[in-house]
């Protein structure tokens, strides 16, 4: 089954790319939307309208270059929308916001073709899927993203560079977009583009929650310590965070929260100083709000660990979200989980 699914996925991707390149000009005429025209002419200078903080530059020379760059431009927190999907419908029950990158065409295609086909799983509930992107060089071409946005109406892109430390900017900017275009959504699930979401299980879980009440549920990490090793991606110097432990936070691979929490988080984020690790930044804002994240074993943001079998479809039937799947693994697991012939001896409820 794996070779066959791999071939199908590869062929689908090739067809998508060729279609985009061949049909772009005739599908998006010269008189297309102003937003698309502005995007095509946009310069690739991500800090052109925000001057560097030279005081910080002089006091952070001992830090790694990525940290110096973050501190130099941390005050820059207002970036333009380049591509934007339509607003949420009035009866949107669940908004799925997925962090992606421009080059991750294969991941987005796999999601749209599997669990992202929300309508087939919604059971009368209105769902909306949105991918969150920054800007990442000339590949793929800007025109290709314009076509993808036009074709699927699920791309939300801002004019800041794709970078691990800029994931916090995605958090802040998507909160603003939700406040402007998707206030009707009862619940919001955030995830990465390498997660498998069991939509029916998520919908069943949310039936018992009130969107007007504060809550955030996921794979909660407690008593995590800042990493002081300058050679690792998660390094945080004392000058940026002095406490011994981070506040409780949900793993950024995926978590779900209420409409009320999103609204309150937006206000807290606007007042908070940006922090380079997005998961922890959300945890800091939750602590400021007095909201404690709730742990749920159905969120596997570190994947399925041994001795459990990460390829057991019966295990997936009892989970809400599993992190770190390749597009091929996502296709495979979706095909198995949705196969009516699949018989499980017992449901693996978390």
UniProtKB/Swiss-Prot annotation:
The protein's role, per its UniProt record: Beta-1,3-N-acetylglucosaminyltransferase involved in the synthesis of poly-N-acetyllactosamine. Has activity for type 2 oligosaccharides.
Transmembrane segments: 5-25
GO MF: N-acetyllactosaminide beta-1,3-N-acetylglucosaminyltransferase activity
Similarity annotation: Belongs to the glycosyltransferase 31 family.
E.C. number: 2.4.1.149, 2.4.1.-
Cytoplasmic side, ranges: 1-4
Organism annotation: Mus musculus
Compartments (UniProt record): Golgi apparatus membrane
Location (main, coarse): Golgi
UniProt feature coiled coil, ranges: none
Membrane topology: Single-pass type II membrane protein
Catalytic activity: a beta-D-galactosyl-(1->4)-N-acetyl-beta-D-glucosaminyl derivative + UDP-N-acetyl-alpha-D-glucosamine = an N-acetyl-beta-D-glucosaminyl-(1->3)-beta-D-galactosyl-(1->4)-N-acetyl-beta-D-glucosaminyl derivative + UDP + H(+)
Gene Ontology CC, one term: Golgi membrane
Glycan attachment positions: 53, 166
InterPro entries linked: Glyco_trans_31
Protein name: N-acetyllactosaminide beta-1,3-N-acetylglucosaminyltransferase 4
PANTHER family for this protein: BETA-1,3-N-ACETYLGLUCOSAMINYLTRANSFERASE (PTHR11214), N-ACETYLLACTOSAMINIDE BETA-1,3-N-ACETYLGLUCOSAMINYLTRANSFERASE 4 (PTHR11214:SF368)
Protein keywords: Glycoprotein, Glycosyltransferase, Golgi apparatus, Membrane, Signal-anchor, Transferase, Transmembrane, Transmembrane helix
Topology feature Lumenal, residues: 26-350
This protein's pathway: Protein modification; protein glycosylation
Gene that encodes it: B3gnt4
GO BP annotation list: poly-N-acetyllactosamine biosynthetic process; protein glycosylation
